[in-house]
Amino acid sequence: MSRPIEFKTILLACLIISVGQLSMGLVFPSLPWIAKDFDISLDQAQLLVSVYLLGFGPSQFIYGPVSDALGRKKVLLAGLLIAMLGLLMIIFLSHTFTGMVAGRFLQGLGTGCCAVLARASTRDRFNGPELPVALSYIAMAASITPLVAPVIGGFINAHFGWTMVFISLLGYVLLAWTVIVFRFQETITQTSAMPSPKKMLLQYRDLLTSRYFMSFASIGWLNFSLMITTVSVMPFIMQNQIGMTSDQYAMWALIPAFGMICGTSICNRVRPIIGTKKMLLVTPILHVSSAAWLFFCPVEPLYLMLGQLLMILGNAIALPCAQAMVMQPYKKQAGAAAAMSGGGQMVVSSIVSMALVQLGLSQAWHLSLVIVVFATITLTNVLRGFATEQPSEQ
């Protein structure tokens, strides 16, 4: 009989990964008010998002290998201290936009540790069939947080002003830091010397040239990209083409969020019975069904959300299964593997979503064609990944 899974470890990982997601999503609704207060354009206010991502994305590639050498807890605490320093800069320099931009970059630089080390510490703790279950909860937290964060941020901004958004973030990061100090137990048993830049680059080169790693990592990258693209396009369809207000859309958007919870629950219950490969093969089926629905359905809220629900169900199954397959062979280099997986996810999703928007993706049937292409690539990578021999323990 298998031992019960350690939910305390999973909850800690979910708390850690939510810090980075909240730090981005909570600020979105405040941008128009920040632009108005500083008498700048909305495009200029978007710089607060861009510089955050500039710090958040690349820093992951450093945190991963460093935590493999020095341990997860020290690196987490140091990263969150940097994030709090950035937030203090934003709060106390809120009278100058330049000061806020500098603070946001520092905040992103600090919170870059969260996604990497949440996954790496989970890989340290769990093995075998427990790993996909644990990672499914983390994937759910990472996916739902960006959906609910703008709703929370909009409420805080509407009732207390945009400065309170950053004060709330500071409080949340401080809470996470305190919990880690007292509750997080180091998951690395042996520390080593700090890796040189050359060694880091060699580790990433080995991962990028691994057919196994790239097959499963790209499944996660493309599924996350599909979610980000849909989140960007669907508000335009619902608000501009249907005439829905942002408050109304926020309520409808809870349906896809519910789909993420359902998909994760289905994955956790069915995967141990049919296996990871068959579970992953369900994703292209759900995505093609979603594409067909969105292509033919009327442009009405309920129909559009049901189509997105089918897509999200596929994402909720693919993300934890692919992440588990990515991390499985890399116990001693879990930080580097998590960094490449998570950092690559950020890079690919940014490029893909921007490229599709630039190509004029603005209709539901446009989205359906994109989903079909992504489903085909996912199917190819699933078959290729399982046909490739798993790398030996690193």
Region roles according to the model:
Residues 277-322:
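C-terminal transmembrane helical hairpin of 12-TM major facilitator-type secondary transporters
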Residues 327-361, 370-371:
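A late C-terminal transmembrane helix in Major Facilitator Superfamily
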Residues 58-96:
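Conserved MFS/SLC helix-loop-helix module at the cytosolic interface between two early adjacent transmembrane helices
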Residues 1-3, 185-216:
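Juxtamembrane intracellular "pre-TM" segments in multi-pass secondary transporters
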Residues 60-71, 263-276:
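Helix-to-loop junctions at the C-terminal end of transmembrane segments
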Residues 86, 98-106, 302-310:
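Paired small-residue
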Residues 103-144:
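Cytoplasmic helix-loop-helix junction between adjacent transmembrane helices
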